[in-house]
């Protein structure tokens, strides 16, 4: 780690020594030699102090975005000019680190002049100049990475230089992209997700609405809902009023055979001037009354109830049957 930190400082020192003859004439801003000396000292101190946390935490900067950036709603809304300026920030920083300025400002490549030139330049300055200074500076990877880290770190220099969090915030604010977005965006996305979940009402799962507890054997006897007596609403089938002659003929047929065949039901319907459904229902009700009065249950039902597999007892009151 110490060898990696010492190499960028040596390259920066060599880069600052090269433009010393042209430092007096290239300071178009009227800066004195003392200002250039202080700028040179600051440039020499920057790689050791500010570059280390940036390089250790972001060794790979091949892509400009991560998956978290793609999932953000504002992804793809940046203008071409903004991305151009953000992408060319490293190359312009390398230009300042090498000591050559495009407009002739700050021959020593001071950090203050670099920031001033970056803020004062309009958007067309993002394009490389005709002399090829940007391409030449970008060709040297060491100088490019060093200068880029200097400008990015100084741009977000509101915090202490030794604080890695401060340098990370500076990088994120200066470029809007980069490796630091992975951790920061995950925190922001989680906070946004929790906020949206808190705003939505509580949702119940589907099985709460679909489960029928009466279908389970452990639910006990099923209870019928008592019928609400509504005088306004008429019954679908009016109660059949049998005459005395009809009741005598039905009872005689029931004593002969409790179960009607289709032919017997049709003949009775014609003789008594009734519907087949009315005769069928009367026979069903009559069989149910006798079965309940005797109390004899089916042997299969008794066997299943003993095993706990059959329980059709009801708790509601039974309605009145058809008149005899």
UniProtKB/Swiss-Prot annotation:
Cerebellar granule cells. It is found in: Nucleus. Its main location: nucleus. Residues 235-294 bind DNA. GO terms for cellular component: fibrillar center; nucleoplasm. Pfam families: Engrail_1_C_sig, Homeodomain. InterPro entries: Engrailed_Homeobox_TFs, HD, HD_engrailed, HD_metazoa, Homeobox-engrailed_C-terminal, Homeobox-engrailed_CS, Homeobox_CS, Homeodomain-like_sf. One of its GO terms (biological process) is dopaminergic neuron differentiation. Residues 1-59, 89-174, 215-240 are annotated as: Disordered. Residues 89-110 have a biased composition (Gly residues). Belongs to the engrailed homeobox family. This is Homeobox protein engrailed-2. The gene is En2.
